[in-house]
Amino acid sequence: MFRRVRRRSQGLIFTAVSRFDRQCGRADARRNARRLLDAAAELLAIDPLVSLEQVSARAKVSRTTLYHHFSSREALLDALTERSVSEVRAALESARTTEGAPDEAMRRALESTWQVVGRYRGLVLINPRRLGRDEVRRRLEPALAPLRLLIVRGQRSGAFDPELAPDWLLALLTDTIHAASAQVSSGAMDTTGAERALLRSAAALLSAP
């Protein structure tokens, strides 16, 4: 009987250790994936042609581990794009776009979005060429839904120009954000100056006559 109890206890311990090892393995995998994506975002902002080898070196992760997570450069860029879209969505949620005066809510939304764009400037440059502008807009569309609703709210209140279609205004805003990011990437403007220009341009685009 004692032998059976001991065997059962050993089995339970082995199962618990195996489960712990699997959990640690998953945690390590998630951590490595985050490090690789962080490194890719950082390096792409400096050099849009950065290689996978440079990404793995910056992340301090082996190339074997990198290829385990991302089979190609395109796979890495797609994963980074997906993460950037998720961060845009979170930024707009934190901006409380349904609260307060529409112009103030728009300022909060653009300031929050600009912080995300700053982290992914490399993607802003390469994705239109890599994916095409229509595909970039398609991927961003769900995340930008709060911004479109804010435009509609502003038009109904008289704060924004009601004569222009919300989708047109949203496209103009998106292009202006990308233009501001490109100015920073080229060195023509610093981040603060580009943000200031973005906010002034957006106010001029949206304001009712």
Go through each PLM region and give its residues.
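Basic, helix-initiating cap at the start of DNA-binding domains
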Residues: 1-46, 50-58, 75-78
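Alpha-helical DNA-contacting segments of helix-turn-helix folds
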Residues: 70, 77-84
